[in-house]
């Protein structure tokens, strides 16, 4: 697995890269309006700038995925991990989690409770559910999440 920092061109292309992944992942969970809102919030050039200004790191996973994370002091927060269908079933999540743990801290994430594929992946890779919470994403959208943690050994 090769994790590479995003180039400026990667940031310009991120929205288009993520759109089909999000339609597949959340199309049965969210309305089209909410999907467009969240895609713009997280993956538009302006949206990404907001997160980069807060210290979020963006990495390409080979040519099949995206990782977004940030150092939160006591732990590393994995904000986004998405793979194209081509990148699934090849062990990328475990390699990503190993990389994040190598930064020296526990890894914490939020997972949409309705995203069963992601929740099962995290559980299979040693994450535990610490709590449930409802996250206000804006625009009238509230997300039922699991807060999950993988401890650094």
Predicted regions mapped to residue ranges:
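A structural signal for short, well-ordered beta-strand segments and their strand-loop junctions
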Residues: 60, 107-108
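Short glycine-rich hinge loops at helix-strand junctions in the catalytic core
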Residues: 91, 126
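Acetyl-CoA-dependent GNAT
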Residues: 5-11, 15-88, 94-99, 151-152
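Extreme N-terminal starter segment of soluble prokaryotic enzymes
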Residues: 1-3
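C-terminal "cap" of GNAT-fold acetyltransferases
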Residues: 108, 112-119, 123-125, 131-153
